[in-house]
Amino acid sequence: MAEKFDHLEEHLEKFVENIRQLGIIVSDFQPSSQAGLSQKLNFIVTGLQDIDKCRQQLHDITVPLEVFEYIDQGRNPQLYTKECLERALAKNEQVKGKIDTMKKFKSLLIQELSKVFPEDMAKYRSIRGEDHPPS
């Protein structure tokens, strides 16, 4: 899969370089540089065609819209991944806390129900396959 991206990256680097060179030609345009300008424009068109061909190999790749927003804001798109992982970790810790709280609640509930309804709770534990009441 990496070779698909390598191929695209190579074409994008060539395209960006041609755009940079075109900018230089245009910024100091002289009638004598018309041939160079036309050549660069042809290279850019060819580069866009090459990039379009890469699109077919990458049709199954999806990029979250937020990544493009990061790029538009001048931020590093890898920060998006970092922030997603941090949010997932925080959510995971929050859910773990809820699970631990529910386990403690269940244990306390069973203890209290065992005090009030010892026979019923003994039946419950036998159905559940528990030999002794939880402490």
UniProtKB/Swiss-Prot annotation:
Keyword line: Activator, Nucleus, Transcription, Transcription regulation
MF-aspect GO terms: transcription coregulator activity; ubiquitin protein ligase activity
GO biological process, alphabetically ordered: positive regulation of transcription by RNA polymerase II; positive regulation of transcription elongation by RNA polymerase II; positive regulation of transcription initiation by RNA polymerase II; protein ubiquitination; RNA polymerase II preinitiation complex assembly; somatic stem cell population maintenance
Gene Ontology cellular-component terms listed: core mediator complex; mediator complex; nucleoplasm; nucleus; ubiquitin ligase complex
Membrane-crossing residue ranges in chain numbering: none
Pfam family for this entry, one: Med10
Subcellular location: Nucleus
Highest taxon, organism lineage: Eukaryota
Principal localisation: nucleus
Quaternary context: Component of the Mediator complex, which is composed of MED1, MED4, MED6, MED7, MED8, MED9, MED10, MED11, MED12, MED13, MED13L, MED14, MED15, MED16, MED17, MED18, MED19, MED20, MED21, MED22, MED23, MED24, MED25, MED26, MED27, MED29, MED30, MED31, CCNC, CDK8 and CDC2L6/CDK11. The MED12, MED13, CCNC and CDK8 subunits form a distinct module termed the CDK8 module. Mediator containing the CDK8 module is less active than Mediator lacking this module in supporting transcriptional activation.
Cross-referenced PANTHER family: MEDIATOR OF RNA POLYMERASE II TRANSCRIPTION SUBUNIT 10 (PTHR13345:SF13)
Function: Component of the Mediator complex, a coactivator involved in the regulated transcription of nearly all RNA polymerase II-dependent genes. Mediator functions as a bridge to convey information from gene-specific regulatory proteins to the basal RNA polymerase II transcription machinery. Mediator is recruited to promoters by direct interactions with regulatory proteins and serves as a scaffold for the assembly of a functional preinitiation complex with RNA polymerase II and the general transcription factors.
Family label: Belongs to the Mediator complex subunit 10 family.
Protein name stated in the entry: Mediator of RNA polymerase II transcription subunit 10
Organism: Mus musculus (Mouse)
